[in-house]
Curated annotation (Swiss-Prot):
The gene is rpl40e. The keyword Cell membrane does not apply. SMART domains: Ribosomal_L40e. The keyword Ribonucleoprotein applies. Keywords: Ribonucleoprotein, Ribosomal protein. This is Large ribosomal subunit protein eL40.
Length: 48
């Protein structure tokens, strides 16, 4: 995980396009590169 909470929020609060794997804003509804609407939240590491 990131050292600072601000850095962690900036790198992990994203959506990933299922088609081209581009990073998109969290509030995006479609991909900025290919226009595909299948976005998923970026996976986060589980804390134990």
């Amino acid at each position: 995980m990131a050292r600072f909470p601000e850095a962690e929020a900036r790198t992990l609060n994203l959506q990933i396009c299922r088609k081209c794997n581009a990073r998109n804003a969290l509030r995006a509804t479609r991909c900025r590169k290919c226009g595909y609407e299948g976005l998923r939240p970026k996976k986060k590491e589980l804390k134990k």
